[in-house]
From Swiss-Prot:
Protein name: Small G protein signaling modulator 1
Region (Required for interaction with RAP family members): 301-350
Tissue-level expression: Mainly expressed in brain, heart and testis.
Lineage: Eukaryota, Metazoa, Chordata, Craniata, Vertebrata
Annotated GO MF terms: GTPase activator activity; small GTPase binding
Stretches with biased composition (Acidic residues): 884-894
Rab-GAP TBC domain: residues covered: 617-1081
UniProt-annotated stretches for the region Disordered: 377-411, 700-830, 871-894
Keyword Membrane listed: yes
Biased composition (Basic residues): 385-397
Cystine residue pairs: none
GO terms for cellular component: cytoplasm; cytoplasmic vesicle membrane; cytosol; Golgi apparatus
Assigned keywords, A-Z: Cytoplasm, Cytoplasmic vesicle, Golgi apparatus, GTPase activation, Membrane
């Protein structure tokens, strides 16, 4: 009897094993979100738990004669514990089902297919069936806990479950695995090979080249007159091309044991050897050898269907359970050849391995894969230092005469071998068929006996009926003289003792009633005894079936046309525009055609230009000139003078809009600074504000790094700096303060604009904000203001607009914003109180005074517009001189701007409402300020992450993007900014490269796109139309989507419709798709985006169908495929789909 320490060590070892297996299962559950029933971790876990439960089990509890001790134990526990009783009943039913199916399969019964679906269990799973089922039924922890509580009844004193500590620990360890959900779904291998979109496309590209279906008259794949016989391989791989390609990849169901490329096979005698990929795969049930030509693996087959089909004919799939012999021929100058011989005597084409020991490596992998149930006979030898080597055996002829070979030859000498695949645990005797009508028994001789060349001995199971006509074409019937002598050690064995893998399936009768009433031993009669059905009845049945199919096809077509008329007629223009009339539109709109049109607008009609764009796109060099026409900024037929007038109006409108939101933004920034200052003031307890500010000045605060504002007049400079000092500069670093002092000294040398230049100057100079009236005087006297943000850029981090300075004698915008005077010595407390009083006073100004201000400003606008336009046109020539400011911007961009603040519009809702006042005297309601603040933060966040990897979006151009977006949102504040709007603006800005022009075109574009955002209702309409299109044009795909859930919501299309496919394509493709969409409105369909979306789905429809994708899978697939689509192919297919719908409507 083992000592106590040894028993304790055994218990700890068993417990550690269970802990390790539990940890692996729980990690798998967390990592993969599920645990599959066939997971190897479950097998290991069941084995570990079973070892613990059986440790120290009493013989009486296990049963004296029972081989399955776990079953005996659980059945005894079931007498007193209901969960164990239920488990016993379920497992016994399952065992009975498995045993019954196994017996019927061994008996070769025809009605085996009528059995209930047998669970696909591996031998190890069957071995641990009781523990495994208890785990899946979530009662294992309860049963073990019961055993722990009643351990004295079932276990010896040294047992693990008898231990007062280890026993409860084991029971508690099982609670976690029993709480998990286990699945049988196909997603079992997603952890192994959850294929990416790349791999799915590649697999589809390989097997999609197989387009021709098998036909009865096609040439056999290997040019061997091979007939269907028991145990033989099909003429072609039984799997479809897709399944064949899928099986080449590693997954949890099939393990790749061996793979080698450039293995030569000669499919036909009249052709050269073809290189291909040889792979050995093992599943729980079968081992398979596959060979695929390199042309299919590389996707390099020709475009001809015949060529594609021929290569698929060459591909081979061989089940090794059908192979008996492996003939290995070694050549000194090559790597060796393997010839496989199957049970029915058919010799497979030789596999020629390249040099380098690949033949031996293949045999080694094959032998390892056969274990533990099978092996090679003779086995490979293991040699120290070399690993597996060929065996050194004396070969004999079939008659037993020894050949002149010795076992001590040099290892490098080329030697031929014949290996047999055997299963040691089973008797492998066969019965030879009697070709002349008599039955003789024969056993297979020694494995290393050579079979004479040109002859294969056929061994089959007794009890099977063979069709003589088939054998006549396969093997010549030997005469009695030619028959090989039978070995003496004949044995007559029962067919039930044969290995199940080698038992041939009997020939099936063509009569269903005969096949159902087949004999129990699998034999059947040579023909059908029933009377033949009259030929007329057969013809009548065929006629009725043809008529029925034609009628239901016609009925389905009528229903489809009804759906087309109801749902799809409004999606397309009914007039079909040809791509070839009056000329081929494949080249699109070229620069030559466009120049001719601009010179003479009557040379081309608008519809003809749109037709060219729809079928061929726009030449990239002229997109900047053509896009404003497509988007409605210009009208086709406008003269150059008319276009200039439109540009001037747009520039003036854009400048005025910018001035409005810049004034509002100034107040927003000021409010934020004041709120920060107020929060800091509350933090000071007992100390004076001065001392507190003094301390804060020396902190490198990151709360805000906004610059203070200044005004052009001397007094406003003083007041503004005082305000800024009391509210903003407490957040600035010491370096910034020093910079402010230096810039203030520089500004003292600059000319100041007197207060007398104010236009109808009723604005309080003490408001603490710059006045737009000062801007007006500056623009009148100095005619070089620039609207280009190349000069001063609004950035998302520094958002304080400042006063525009005259160009001649002006200072840097940072200097103007930070300017101060040395006479600013007023105490900050007094200034803060005074500003508060002035703000209250200004808030109560009457509406009449406000209207008088804006009325005067409107009168001055025409004078300013000329100046504004001159400054805008000069911005392009000035931008090259701003290199220094752009460099500074890239490091720490400022938020000040040199845009002219023109007259602002009245935006307040009530004269008596307390509202902040801008520098121009315009009042803003608190609701408006809050709304703009929210949108401003959203815009800044999106602008900073808009296509950062695209070359165009430098910090300066991002500022242009921000300016345009803020201007648009200011005009549509009731809608506000929604994520994605920047994506729609970005391509316009890239092409047009002009703020005002891009602003106008974006406004036109948003008239259509606004409805796709949440505040519109177009998205649901798109989904419904998409559903109708797929239902009509691709019923198979529609059925899949109907099967996989809520098919009425095509959410995977949401981003496509929201952004016009902007995130699905690269920029060059976005340009092409967008201009096609805009032209399609007038040529084919105002809903062309639907057909592009359908085309995208159709391009990958086979992949979607093959992988049975649900909406989550489709979204994931298209996200991974973003910016990698063949856009020209998609657009061509979209045009074809439009034409198809137009034709359906036309023929209704």
């Amino acid at each position: 009897m083992a000592s106590a320490p040894a028993e304790a060590e055994t218990r700890q070892r068993l417990l550690r094993t269970v802990k390790k297996e539990v940890k692996q299962i729980m990690e798998e559950a967390v990592t993969r979100k599920f645990v599959h029933e066939d997971s190897s971790h479950i097998i290991s876990f069941c084995a570990a738990v079973e070892a613990c439960v059986l440790h120290g089990l009493r013989r009486r509890a296990a049963g004296f004669l029972r081989s399955n001790k776990i079953a005996a134990l659980f059945m005894k526990v079931g007498k007193n514990f209901p969960p164990a009783e239920d488990l016993s009943r379920k497992v016994q039913d399952l065992e009975q089902l498995i045993e019954s199916a196994r017996n019927q399969i061994q008996g070769l019964q025809e009605n085996v297919r009528k059995l209930p679906k047998l669970p696909n269990l591996s031998p190890l799973a069957i071995k641990h069936l009781w523990i495994r089922t208890a785990l899946f039924e979530k009662v294992l922890d309860k049963i073990v806990h019961y055993l722990v509580e009643n351990s004295s009844k079932y276990y010896e004193k040294e047992a693990l479950l008898m231990d007062p500590v280890d026993g409860p620990i084991l029971a508690s360890l099982l609670v976690g695995p029993c709480a998990l959900e286990y699945t049988k779904m196909k997603t079992a291998d997603h952890f192994w090979t959850d294929p990416s979109a790349d791999e799915l496309v590649q697999r589809h590209r390989i097997h999609s080249s197989h387009v021709r279906q098998d036909s009865p008259t096609k040439r056999p794949a290997l040019c061997i007159q091979k007939r269907h016989s028991s145990g033989s391989m099909d003429d072609r791989p039984s799997l479809s091309a897709r399944d064949y390609v899928e099986s080449l990849h590693q997954n949890s169901r099939a393990t790749l044991l061996y793979g080698k490329n450039n293995v030569l096979v000669q499919p036909r005698d009249d052709m050269e050897a073809v290189p291909g990929y040889l792979s050995l795969h093992q599943t729980a049930d079968v081992m398979t050898l596959k060979w695929t030509p390199n042309q299919l693996m590389n996707g390099s087959v020709g475009d001809l269907d015949y060529e594609k089909s021929v290569y698929w004919d060459y591909a081979m799939t061989i089940r090794l359970e059908e192979i008996v012999y492996l003939h290995c021929h070694q050549q000194v100058d090559s790597g060796g050849t393997v010839v496989l011989v199957s049970q029915d005597g058919i010799q497979r084409p030789p596999f020629r391995f390249p040099k380098g020991g690949h033949l031996l490596q293949f045999l080694s992998c094959l032998e390892n894969g056969l274990l533990p149930h099978g092996q090679l006979d003779p086995p490979l030898w293991s040699q120290r230092g070399k690993g597996k080597v060929f065996p050194k055996l004396r070969k004999r002829s079939p008659q037993g005469s020894a050949e002149s070979t010795s076992s001590d030859k040099d290892d490098d000498e080329a030697t031929d071998y014949v290996f047999r695949i055997i299963y040691p645990g089973m008797q492998s005797e066969f019965v030879a068929p009697d070709f002349l009508g008599s039955t003789s028994s024969v056993s297979v001789g020694p494995a290393w006996m050579m079979v004479p060349a040109g002859r294969s001995m056929l061994v089959v199971a007794r009890g099977s009926q063979w069709e003589p006509a088939r054998w006549d074409t396969t093997l010549p019937t030997p005469s009695p003289k030619e028959q090989p002598p039978m070995p003496q050690d004949l044995m007559d064995v029962s067919v039930s003792n044969l290995p199940s893998l080698w038992q041939p399936s009997p020939r099936k009768s063509s009569c269903s009633s005969c096949s159902q009433s087949g004999s129990a031993d699998g034999s059947s009669t040579n023909g059908c005894n029933h009377e033949r059905a009259p030929l007329k009845l057969l013809c009548d049945n065929m006629k009725y079936q043809i008529l029925s199919r034609a009628f239901y096809g016609w009925l389905a077509y009528c229903r489809h046309l009804s759906t087309v008329r109801t749902h799809l007629s409004a999606l397309v223009n009914h007039m079909i525009v040809s791509p070839d009339l009056p000329c081929d539109a494949g080249q699109g709109l070229t620069a030559r055609i466009w120049e001719q049109y601009l010179h003479d607008s009557t040379s081309y009609e608008e519809q003809e230009l749109l037709r060219l764009i729809y079928y061929g796109g726009i030449q990239p060099e002229i997109r900047k000139a053509v896009w404003p026409f497509l988007l409605g900024h210009y009208q086709f037929g406008m003269t150059e003078t008319e276009r200039k007038e439109v540009d001037e109006q747009i520039h003036a409108c854009y400048a005025q809009t910018m001035a409005e939101w810049l004034g509002c933004e100034a107040i927003v920034r000021q409010r934020e600074r004041e709120s920060h200052a107020a929060a800091l003031a509350k933090c000071s307890s007992g100390a004076s504000l001065d001392s507190h500010l003094h301390r804060m000045l020396h902190r490198d605060s990151t709360i805000s790094n906004e610059s203070s504002q200044s005004c052009s007049s001397g007094r406003q400079n003083i007041r503004l700096h005082s305000d800024s000092s009391s509210s903003t500069q407490v957040f600035e670093s010491v370096d910034e303060v020093e910079q402010v002092e230096a810039e203030g000294r520089l500004e003292e040398k600059q000319p100041k604009i007197p207060n007398g230049n104010l236009v109808n100057g009723t604005c309080s100079p003490d408001s603490g904000h710059p006045s737009s009236h000062n801007f007006s005087s500056g623009l009148s006297e100095h005619s070089e203001p620039s609207l280009s943000t190349e000069d001063s850029v609004l950035d998302a981090q520094r958002n304080t607009p400042t006063v525009l300075r005259p160009r001649d004698g002006s200072v840097d915008d940072r200097q103007s914003s930070e300017a101060t005077t040395s006479q600013d010595e007023a105490p900050r407390e007094e200034l803060a109180v005074q500003d508060s009083l002035e703000s209250d006073l200004l808030a109560n100004e009457s509406m009449d005074e406000f209207m008088s201000i804006t009325g005067s400003l409107d009168m001055a606008l025409p004078e300013k517009d000329d100046v504004v336009m001159e400054g805008w046109r000069s911005s392009e020539t000035e931008k090259h001189g701003q290199a220094d400011s752009e460099d500074n911007l890239s490091e720490e961009p400022e938020m000040e701007s040199l845009f002219p603040a023109l007259a602002s519009l009245a935006v307040t809702t009530s004269a008596n409402e307390v509202s902040p006042v801008s520098s121009s005297g315009v009042t803003y309601s608190p609701e408006l300020l809050d709304l703009y603040t929210v949108n401003l933060h959203r815009i800044e966040k999106d602008v900073q992450r808009c296509d950062r990897n695209y070359w165009y979006f430098t910090p300066a151009n991002l500022e242009k993007l921000r300016n345009i977006m803020c201007s648009y949102i200011w005009q549509h504040i009731e809608i506000g900014y929604v994520q994605g709007m920047c994506d729609l603006l970005a391509p316009l800005l890239v092409i047009l490269d002009d703020e005002a022009l891009a602003f106008s075109c974006f406004t036109e574009l948003m008239k259509r796109m606004n409805q796709n955002f949440p505040h519109g209702g177009a998205m649901d309409t798109h989904f419904a139309n998409m559903r109708s299109l797929i239902q009509i044009l691709d019923s198979e795909l529609f059925e899949l989507m109907h099967q996989n859930g809520d098919y009425t919501h095509f959410y995977f299309c949401y981003r496509w419709f929201l952004l016009d496919f902007k995130r699905e394509l690269v920029y060059d493709d976005v340009f092409l798709v967008w201009e096609t969409i805009w032209a399609a409105k007038h040529v084919s369909s105002a809903h062309y985006v639907l057909f592009i979306a359908l085309a995208l789905v159709e391009v990958y429809r086979d992949i979607i169908l093959e992988n049975n994708m649900d909406f989550t899978d489709i979204i994931k697939f298209f996200n991974e495929m973003a910016e990698r689509h063949n856009t020209k192919q998609v657009l061509k297919l979209a045009r074809d789909l439009v034409y198809k719908v137009q034709t359906l409507i036309e023929n209704k």
